[in-house]
C-alpha cells in the first residue's frame, strides 16, 4: 500500500508526464485498482486498513501538487486536493471500470491501442493544467 501511495510523490514534475506515469502505473497494477474498489464496497466512512499512514501519504501527495503549483508547473487557481483527486480518477478509471472503457471507446483497457490513445489524451489534457507560460513552452517543444 505504501508503494502505491508513493505514486504521487515519485511522479514526474511535468503535468503531462505525471498523468502518463500514473496511468501506466495503474495499467501495470490492476490488482491494486481492484483492491481499492473492493475496499470501497465496505464501510469506508470508518477508518480503512492503514488509514493514518495512507492519509499521511496522500497529504504528502497534495503537498507535492501544491509545491508544483508554487513553482509554476501547475495552475495555481485550482485546489491541490481536488486536482490530485481528478488526476487519480483520470488515470485509474479505465482499469477500475473496464466495462465503461469498452462501451465508450470500443477497446478494452488492456488493449495496446487503448493504452496508446489514452496516454496521448492525458498528455493533451494536461496542457490545460499548466499555467499559460508553461503551456506555451510545451507547445514550442512539439
Descriptions of predicted regions:
Residues 3, 16-38, 45-48, 91-99, ...:
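Helical hydrophobic small-molecule/effector-binding pocket
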Residues 39-40, 82:
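A general secondary-structure junction signal
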Residues 4, 43-47, 107-111:
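A short, mixed-charge helix-start or loop-turn motif at secondary-structure junctions
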Residues 2-3, 45-71, 81-85, 116-120:
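Amphipathic alpha-helical packing segments from all-alpha helical-bundle domains
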Residues 2-9, 41, 70-73, 99, ...:
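Short, flexible helix-adjacent loops and helix caps
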Residues 76:
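Short beta-strand "wing" residues that participate in macromolecule-binding interfaces
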Residues 28, 59, 63-71, 89-142:
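C-terminal peripheral helix-coil segments that are non-catalytic and often amphipathic
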Residues 2-34, 53-54, 58-60, 80-84:
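Hydrophobic alpha-helical connector segments
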